[in-house]
Swiss-Prot record:
Belongs to the GcvP family. Its EC number is 1.4.4.2. The glycine cleavage system catalyzes the degradation of glycine. The P protein binds the alpha-amino group of glycine through its pyridoxal phosphate cofactor; CO(2) is released and the remaining methylamine moiety is then transferred to the lipoamide cofactor of the H protein. GO terms for biological process: glycine decarboxylation via glycine cleavage system. The modification N6-(pyridoxal phosphate)lysine is found at residue 708. One of its GO terms (cellular component) is glycine cleavage complex. This is Glycine dehydrogenase (decarboxylating). It comes from Salmonella typhimurium (strain LT2 / SGSC1412 / ATCC 700720). The lineage of its organism: Bacteria, Pseudomonadati, Pseudomonadota, Gammaproteobacteria, Enterobacterales.
């Protein structure tokens, strides 16, 4: 039969690239699960009353090439002016060796958060290096492996200061008036929900206020002034006030460490260590504190431990501080951080080393000195005598200066009264400085760069002597070894080989949606048109961004059934927080601010109660019935009991138990009946898109994990994006921004992230995904995700009971395998199975969530039948191994499961086990064998002997 031109054009070609099983394989799996078609399977599983009659109208699919061309044209509407705005964001030079071998490498960007350390040693080492950079530059004892951005790190510092403060009755937090405005914005938002009183004043007046538990200072103020706060910090410490200092990574290369001056907490952005501005993100924040406060720190901390053979190995330390364990009592709601960006910054430091970093920092400072000397020579006044890279220049005719700057395609900071701000960076050249002279002085200034250089080289006093660093930094060999590109390339590859990412195998983590991050989706994030924009540039220079964000928002509105979307939250946990704040402010607008009870099912993800606590709410747990569903009687009873104070319910759909609850609409109705709002967690949106929607179900607000459902890669633990969709009545209460208030922003509420659109530069990934899939492709993706999960459940249910199912024994897009009966019968645990899967070449499913003693499997639609079968075969083979233990063939204390994973060196070591070396290391054959580099980690040793900085190189070898 002759094909039409439309068929030959094959505009939906990407759908077949994204979805793993082809039509024939889908039919095989449908036959295996007893369904005629995808639509029939969906009809059996999803409650009839929430099924959409037609998919949301987000357009037809486009080819990869057509979508890239369309987005390139949109990106071309952005104007790339040279930015001197500063305010915590500068242009950078990302070394090409890091760009190509990390940022553009799926071996790095498709990995997951390193909960399974045996398959994560490479990125754990890179993160440990990041912590070492932070420790050296801040002068403190303990550092985390990144937070979301500088402003949220400031909010975390405030919360931590209150936790550790000995002044238990103090409720005031002092912020120096020259912190970045976006930092103050986010701090105020967080303080409101905690009930803290924020005082903003000149730092010198910090001692004038009583009942202050913490103080926030900025070492280099937002307009450039270097502050020597040593005396102030000493006095504050004598009053038992917790002192936090915001600092700049590049400035710290030359400036004295705040920790040496007595600061308790030091934080800031690592953006200028090689990470593009990206119109606001993603960027990693660094965070450090004194050792005595380590158990109160927020975020991931990488620690050095031992494996079962006694070898040095790395792991995430002190996880009992975190939301997935402590829930509403956690130090923070942080789940996703910024691992990929922290690793870029880490490797930037490795590549340049201390000598290279000092050269870069000194060059930036020298150019700033030259600029300052020339301007002063011509009669212009500088507001500050002490500076690193930023000048605050008083100008008589500010409008004329800004007009000349615009004509020269230059952005200066313009929000300072009767002055302009100018921040230089590592991309600044002497030609740029000459151009700045022209802008500020006119063309006839007659200044000579070489002459000015000689003058300032002989007599630079712009950094006060007391603030010059006098100690060595980055002395560890890792920062002094890999300075040629060949060495750096090999070092990065050696780290990558230690890890297991999607470029090697399926990562079947339940509740994580480890789907394909297609190359075509990733390409635009490094386009200069997207990568090089400052988040506070004039809006007319970011028209391409605004068009792309507007289109993406419109698509997400249609896909969610909501009325508006806010793009600011830069992680799922931040989205939860922002959504709950919208609910809180909505109630306050109706004079019902007393509503503070948040109902949360017992099965909820740990971020839910942690976010509710952070939003100033009290958590009341709702029971689940024996089938894993929300117990409607318990829900109704608690909603009625707390009717006067009911704020909301946080519910996940499909549930965290992996089923579509039949009564979800009734859940919404009960909560609404008693005056509450419905927060539907978007973690499992991959089983909704095109089939149903939160708005159609009856929810009021949801966050969307763009790093799950909409293809932003997990990056080994970040970046993420968590925009929120809201019904119209909540739209006025989503986050706003104090710096960028452009037309079309929905609100004037406080910010939850440093930048107005969060991590804007990764939004093109989700734009590309939706554009290439189209309405039908998105629905098919959800349906195949459901098919793949049911295929696994169907084939494994006789070996491992499936804990929860819905109608007709079906699951949603994930399934929970119950290991508890096997453990009781044989002594083999879910942990043993998880570690044995490594020997078979797989990352483990999610362990003991949402039910202890289980494994939750989510295959996603991107995995083909061959990979699903490989996983199923591995799980069945492991079940056979468990039977060998049960039969007494292998003793419980010495078998392939409890000794897993096995490493290469065991092949040539003395062998005393009752099973063969071949069974140990080649259970699935020799082809494409993944080799872990460490054996099972000793978690207890790691936390009892906490060590969170770089170890000797010999320990890695």
């Amino acid at each position: 039969m002759t094909q039409t031109l439309s068929q030959l054009e094959n505009r939906g070609a990407f759908i077949e690239r994204h979805i793993g099983p082809d039509a024939a394989q889908q039919q095989e799996m449908l036959n295996a699960v007893g369904a005629e078609s995808l639509n029939a399977l969906t009809g059996q599983i999803v409650p009839k009353d929430i099924q959409l009659a037609t998919p949301p109208q987000v357009g037809e699919a486009a080819t990869e090439y057509a979508a890239l061309a369309e987005l390139k044209a949109i990106a071309g509407r952005n104007k790339r002016f040279t930015s001197y705005i500063g305010m915590g964001y500068t242009a950078v030079q990302l070394p090409p060796v890091i760009l190509r071998n990390m940022l553009e490498n799926p071996g790095w960007y498709t990995a997951y958060t390193p909960y399974q350390p045996e398959v994560s040693q490479g990125r754990l080492e890179a993160l440990l290096n990041f912590q070492q950079v932070t420790l050296d530059l801040t002068g403190l004892d303990m550092a985390s492996a990144s937070l979301l951005d500088e402003a949220t790190a400031a909010a975390e510092a405030m919360a931590m200061a209150k936790r550790v403060s000995k002044l238990k009755n103090a409720n005031r937090f002092f912020v120096a008036s020259d912190v970045h405005p976006q930092t103050l914005d986010v701090v105020r938002t967080r303080a409101e929900t905690f009930g803290f009183d924020v005082i903003v004043d000149d730092a010198a007046k910090a001692l004038d206020h009583q009942d202050v538990f913490g103080v926030l200072l900025q070492q280099v103020g937002t307009t450039g002034e270097i502050h020597d706060y040593s005396a102030l910090i000493t006095e504050l410490k004598s009053r038992k006030v917790v002192v936090s200092v915001a600092a700049d990574f590049m400035a710290l290369v030359l400036l004295t460490a705040p920790g040496k001056q007595g600061a308790d907490i030091v934080f800031g952005s690592a953006q200028r260590f090689g990470v593009p501005m990206g119109y606001g993100g993603p960027h990693a924040a660094f965070f450090a504190a004194k050792d005595e406060f380590k158990r109160s720190m927020p975020g991931r901390i990488i620690g050095v431990s031992k494996d079962a053979a006694g070898n040095t190995a790395l792991r995430m330390a002190m996880q009992t501080r975190e939301q997935h364990i402590r829930r509403e009592k956690a130090n923070s709601n942080i789940c996703t951080s910024q691992v990929l960006l922290a690793n870029i910054a880490s490797l930037y430091a490795v590549y340049h080393g201390p000598v290279g970093l000092k050269r870069i920092a000194n060059r930036i400072h020298r150019l700033t000195d030259i600029l300052a000397a020339g301007l002063q020579q011509k009669g212009l006044k500088l507001r500050h005598a002490h500076y690193f890279d930023t000048l605050c220049v008083e100008v008589a005719d500010k409008a004329a200066v800004l007009a000349r700057a615009e004509a020269a395609e230059i952005n200066l900071r313009s929000d300072i009264h009767n002055a302009v701000g100018i921040t230089l960076d590592e991309t600044t050249t002497r030609e740029n400085v000459a151009q700045l002279f022209n802008v500020l002085l006119g063309d006839s200034h007659g200044l000579n760069i070489e002459t000015l250089d000689k003058d300032v080289a002989l007599d630079s006093r712009s950094i006060q002597q007391s603030m010059l660093r006098d100690d060595a930094i980055l002395t560890h060999p890792v920062f002094n070894r890999y300075h040629s590109e060949t060495e750096m390339m090999r070092y990065m590859h050696s780290l990558e080989r230690k890890d297991l990412a999607l470029n090697q195998a399926m990562i079947p983590l339940g509740s994580c949606t480890m789907k394909l991050n297609a190359a075509a989706e990733m390409i635009p994030i490094t386009w200069p048109e997207f990568a090089e924009l400052h988040p506070f540039c004039p809006p007319e220079q970011a028209e391409g961004y605004h068009q792309m964000i507007s289109q993406l928002s419109d698509w997400l509105v249609k896909l969610t059934g909501y009325d508006a979307v806010c793009m600011q939250p830069n992680s799922g946990a931040q989205g939860e927080y922002a959504g709950l704040l919208a609910i809180r402010h909505y109630h306050e607008s109706r004079n019902e601010g007393h509503r503070d009870i948040c109902l949360i099912p017992a099965s909820a993800h740990g971020t839910n109660p942690a976010s509710a606590h952070m939003a100033g709410m009290q958590v009341v747990v709702v029971a689940c019935d024996k089938n894993g569903n929300i117990d409607l009687d318990d829900l109704r009873a608690k909603a009625e009991q707390h009717a006067a104070n009911l704020s909301c319910i946080m519910v996940t759909y499909p549930s965290t138990h992996g089923v579509y609850e039949e009564t979800i609409r009734e859940v919404c109705e009960v909560v609404h009946q008693f005056g509450g709002q419905v927060y539907l967690d978007g973690a499992n949106m991959n089983a909704q898109v095109g089939i149903t929607s939160p708005g159609f179900i009856g929810a009021d607000v949801s966050h969307l994990n763009l790093h799950k459902t909409f293809c932003i890669p997990h990056g080994g633990g970040g970046p993420g994006m968590g925009p929120i969709g809201v019904k119209a009545h909540l739209a006025p209460f989503v986050p706003g921004h104090s710096v960028v208030q452009i037309e079309g922003m929905l609100t004037r509420q406080g910010a939850v992230s440093a930048a107005p659109f969060g991590s804007a530069s990764i939004l093109p990934i989700s734009w590309m995904y939706i554009r290439m899939m189209g309405a039908e492709g998105l629905k098919q993706a959800s349906q195949v995700a459901i098919l793949n999960a049911n295929y696994i459940a169907s084939r494994l249910k006789d070996a491992y009971p499936v804990l929860y199912t819905g109608r007709d024994g079906r699951v949603a897009h994930e399934c929970i395998l119950d290991i508890r009966p096997l453990k009781e019968e044989t002594g083999i645990s879910e942990l043993d199975i998880a570690k044995r899967l490594i020997d078979y070449g797989f990352h483990a499913p999610t362990m003991s969530f949402p039910v202890a003693g289980t494994l939750m499997v989510e295959p996603t639609e991107s995995e083909g039948k061959a990979e699903l079968d490989r996983f199923i075969d591995a799980m069945l083979a492991i079940r056979a191994e468990i039977d060998q233990v049960k039969a007494g063939v292998w003793p419980l204390e010495d078998n392939p499961l409890v000794n897993a994973p096995h490493i290469q060196s065991e092949l040539v070591a003395e062998w005393a086990h009752p099973y063969s070396r071949e069974v140990a290391v080649f259970p699935a054959g020799v082809a494409d064998k993944y080799w872990p580099t460490v054996k099972r980690l000793d978690d207890v040793y790691g936390d009892r002997n906490l060590f969170c900085s770089c170890v000797p190189i010999s320990d890695y070898q």
